[in-house]
């Protein structure tokens, strides 16, 4: 089953006949595989690890699948070139210029750019957002509550450098000053959000192997290592830009941790002495509640004897019931008008 944006691309796939195609920021469907009906070859870069895992089993000699903030093994001066680059307009609008720059660095001169997105997702402003090295965006289709725009590479784009897309700032935490590196598209308020502040203000003493689930830009990870530098810390997230941000944050603070993608806890192994998180479960959608349920269930299985589990969660959502069902007795260590801090120790 194709998502609505992917269906719109299929409606317009004739322009891809025998093209070498790059798909950026694709969704959890098999659109890149379907394009092989007309395209000569397709490379697909997912920025969401779940989307990558959905497509990766279908890779073959004509379909290469990647996860990350960039294609791997690229010479900055000699990037691989494509006849067409398809960009799925990102949910995090600040990520759009990054994707356009990446697309331009991979297009042949006058190569075709296609941008697709849902009407409610910000794509209506595409013409204003396209950099000057692209021709004016033209609306090609309007269907399935989505828009498809086309353009072509007319000028020379700046070379792709990750450092151009980072904002770095100092953050005061209960553990002290830390330096945060935030890439475009990663959540940041340039101050401690209320949930993270609540968690860090009541940080337990940990030891051994600790997991930071949904690490984002690495705020919790850096604060943890600032207070307890001997921890063997692992940081997981589903988002490529978040993982790259976390790595940059740790490096900026002279810290080390194992940073890697995981769909929920599926890619983690073994048991942890501590699991700490301000998980991205604050919107109350059914799909998000399901992810929260899986996280709670799976993390309970991966907690060592005497291990500590502490997460902050939106007090207005039913996560306390989910947590209580899995852990039984647990403490609400602290709360404010928006969040509760849950604590459990595996006895």
From Swiss-Prot:
Q: Which Pfam families does the record cross-reference, listed alphabetically?
A: MTS, MTS_N
Q: Which residues form the signal peptide?
A: none
Top EC category: transferase
Per UniProt, what is one GO molecular function of this protein? 16S rRNA (guanine(1207)-N(2))-methyltransferase activity
Q: Which UniProt keywords apply?
A: Cytoplasm, Methyltransferase, rRNA processing, S-adenosyl-L-methionine, Transferase
| EC number of this enzyme | 2.1.1.172
Catalytic activities: guanosine(1207) in 16S rRNA + S-adenosyl-L-methionine = N(2)-methylguanosine(1207) in 16S rRNA + S-adenosyl-L-homocysteine + H(+)
Any Gene Ontology CC annotation: cytoplasm
- UniProt xrefs under InterPro entries: DNA_methylase_N6_adenine_CS, Mtase_sm_N, rRNA_ssu_MeTfrase_C, RsmC/RlmG, SAM-dependent_MTases_sf, Small_mtfrase_dom
Its annotated compartments are: Cytoplasm
UniProt superkingdom: Bacteria
Check the record and name the CDD domains matching this protein. Answer: AdoMet_MTases
Describe its function.
Specifically methylates the guanine in position 1207 of 16S rRNA in the 30S particle.
Subunit and interaction comment? Monomer.
Q: Which family does it belong to?
A: Belongs to the methyltransferase superfamily. RsmC family.
Spell out the PANTHER family in the cross-references.
Answer: RIBOSOMAL RNA SMALL SUBUNIT METHYLTRANSFERASE C
- Name the UniProt record assigns to this protein: Ribosomal RNA small subunit methyltransferase C
This protein's encoding gene: rsmC
């Amino acid at each position: 089953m194709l998502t609505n944006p992917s269906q719109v691309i299929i409606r317009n796939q004739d322009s891809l006949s025998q093209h070498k195609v790059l798909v950026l920021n694709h969704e959890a469907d098999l659109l890149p595989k379907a394009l092989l009906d007309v395209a000569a070859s397709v490379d697909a870069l997912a920025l969401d690890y779940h989307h990558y895992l959905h497509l990766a089993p279908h890779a073959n000699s004509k379909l290469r699948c990647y996860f990350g903030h960039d294609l791997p093994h690229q010479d900055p001066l000699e990037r691989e070139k494509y006849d067409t680059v398809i960009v799925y307009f990102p949910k995090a609008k600040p990520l759009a210029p990054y994707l356009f720059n990446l697309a331009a660095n991979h297009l042949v001169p006058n190569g075709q750019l296609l941008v697709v997105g849902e009407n409610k997702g910000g794509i209506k402003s595409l013409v204003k957002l396209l950099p000057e090295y692209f021709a004016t965006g033209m609306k090609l289709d309007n269907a399935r509550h989505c828009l498809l725009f086309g353009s072509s590479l007319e000028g020379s784009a700046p070379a792709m450098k990750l450092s151009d897309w980072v904002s770095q700032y100092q953050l005061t935490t209960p553990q002290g000053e830390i330096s945060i590196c935030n890439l475009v598209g990663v959540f940041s308020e340039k101050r401690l959000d209320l949930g993270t502040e609540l968690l860090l203000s009541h940080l337990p003493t940990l030891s051994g192997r600790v997991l930071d689930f949904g690490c984002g830009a690495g705020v919790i990870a850096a604060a943890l290592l600032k207070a307890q530098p001997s921890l063997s810390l692992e940081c997981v997230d589903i988002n490529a830009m978040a993982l790259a941000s976390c790595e940059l944050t740790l490096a900026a603070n002279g810290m080390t941790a194992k940073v890697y993608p995981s769909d929920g806890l599926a890619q983690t192994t073994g048991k942890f002495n501590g699991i700490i998180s301000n998980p991205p479960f604050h919107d109350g959608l059914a799909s998000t509640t399901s992810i929260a349920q899986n996280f709670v269930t799976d993390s309970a299985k991966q907690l060592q004897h005497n291990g500590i589990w502490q997460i902050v969660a939106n007090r207005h959502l039913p996560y306390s019931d989910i947590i209580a069902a899995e852990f039984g007795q647990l403490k609400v260590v602290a709360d404010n008008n928006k969040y509760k801090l849950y604590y459990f120790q595996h006895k």
